[in-house]
């Protein structure tokens, strides 16, 4: 028995896969993801985008809620390296017009490897 606790908006794909696989499961959304206004400190960091070597999005929610702020504070001439953990996160970023790389393995270990290979010292991470 699997209990899928993801918010309804993020659970459908998993629920469909579980149902097609014949695995017993129930969907019990125990969390809710809401958008709030960023703090002044966060807005300051966004105004310094050119000082980061890489911008990282760790989840679909981080991309959904963070991408608009990134777009707002990014000059069209600024060439940012953007990384996404997973294809779903990359798809959300693409919907916002942002091109991103996905680490092999689609996980934190793959991300760490990519960062190490690129010698990225200063990262801005959107997670959520």
Region annotations inferred by a language model:
Residues 1-128:
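Conserved beta-alpha
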């Amino acid at each position: 028995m699997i209990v899928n606790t993801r918010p309804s908006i993020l659970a459908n794909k998993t629920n469909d896969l579980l149902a097609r696989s014949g695995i017993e499961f129930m969907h019990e959304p125990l969390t809710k993801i809401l958008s709030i206004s960023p703090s002044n400190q966060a807005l300051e960091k966004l105004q310094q985008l050119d000082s980061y070597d890489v911008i990282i999005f760790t989840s679909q929610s981080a991309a959904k809620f963070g991408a608009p702020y990134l777009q707002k504070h990014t000059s069209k001439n600024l060439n940012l390296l953007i990384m996404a953990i997973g294809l779903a996160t990359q798809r959300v970023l693409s919907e916002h017009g942002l091109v991103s790389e996905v680490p092999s393995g689609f996980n934190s270990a793959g991300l760490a490897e990519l960062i190490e290979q690129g010698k990225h010292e200063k990262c801005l991470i959107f997670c959520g």
